[in-house]
Design a protein with these regions (language model features):
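Residues within the alpha-helical elements of helix-turn-helix
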Residues: 18, 29, 58
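Short, basic-rich loop-to-helix N-cap that marks the start of a DNA-contacting helix
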Residues: 44-59, 74
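Short alpha-helical DNA-recognition segment
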Residues: 21-39
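Short amphipathic recognition helices of helix-turn-helix/homeodomain-type DNA-binding modules
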Residues: 62-91
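A short, Lys/Arg-rich alpha-helix, primarily the initiator
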Residues: 1-21
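Residues within the helices of the helix-turn-helix
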Residues: 13, 24, 53
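Residue-level detection of the helix-turn-helix DNA-binding "recognition helix"
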Residues: 31, 42, 71
Length: 93
């Protein structure tokens, strides 16, 4: 059975619900515009290292958690490279 990969915003959404915080409250805590928080939660904006540190401070977690979730999501959602790359490597070798 394949593991389902979720965007990090889903985990933020769940954490906000568990704490009873709105996106607006979270934006105010982080000192970020509501639009930015909404874009992160909806997977339209990536979590940067700085944002990961801020989220971690607010939730009492490690920034590594948020960076790992972001990187896993990006790797999962990015198309595979052109299959002809190996052919071109062989041509050069």
């Amino acid at each position: 059975m394949a593991t389902q990969i979720l965007p990090p915003g889903e985990f933020i959404r769940e954490e906000l619900e568990a704490r009873g915080w709105s996106q607006a409250t979270f934006a105010r805590i982080l000192g970020r515009p509501l639009q930015t928080i909404n874009q992160i939660i909806n997977g339209k904006k990536a979590i940067t290292a700085q944002t990961a540190k801020e989220i971690a401070a607010a939730f009492g977690t490690s920034p590594d958690v948020w960076m790992n979730l972001e990187m896993t999501w990006q790797l999962h959602s990015t198309p595979e490279p052109d299959g002809r790359i190996l052919d071109r490597v062989r041509q050069v070798a």
